[in-house]
Amino acid sequence: MQIQNIDHIVLTVANIEKTIEFYTRILGFQLVTFGDNRKALTFGNQKINLHQKGHEFEPKAKHPTAGSADLCFISATDIHNVLEELKQKNIEIIEGIVDRTGALGKIKSVYFRDPDQNLIEISNYLS
């Protein structure tokens, strides 16, 4: 077996509307409605399906929990501009700009939390 990439992930959230508002307003993701009024967020060629806590679609994670994710997104925007934009949008910065290692090499990152307290990392790969 040879796995090529991740098709989508699922976030279990306490409030789908708050999650949609955050990810579309703060990160510029697009809202997609599919199937039986299911909601997803897209960016580039990636997709995050949203499950409302207590009303998850089957099959689901064994213990679906809001706020347990730690996600790293690579931005085309310079990390210094990312940090400034987050501050302008009144997002509390947990840490940044810091050196980290991503899947393809060294990155510079900024950390903050979404409405469910998931840890969100926005990064740039170093040239």
Residue ranges and their predicted role:
Residues 1-6, 12-31, 44-95, 113-127:
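Glyoxalase I/VOC metalloenzyme domain signal
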Residues 94-102:
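Short, basic/aromatic recognition patches
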Residues 36-37, 99:
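Residue-level "edge-of-site" marker
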Residues 35, 104-107:
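Short, small/polar residue-rich loop motifs at catalytic or cofactor-binding pockets
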Residues 97, 107-109:
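Low-complexity, intrinsically disordered Gly/Pro/Thr-rich segments
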Residues 39-42:
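Minor-groove-contacting beta-hairpin "wing" of winged helix-turn-helix DNA-binding domains
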Residues 57, 102-103:
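Low-complexity, polar-biased intrinsically disordered regions enriched in Pro/Ser/Thr/Gly
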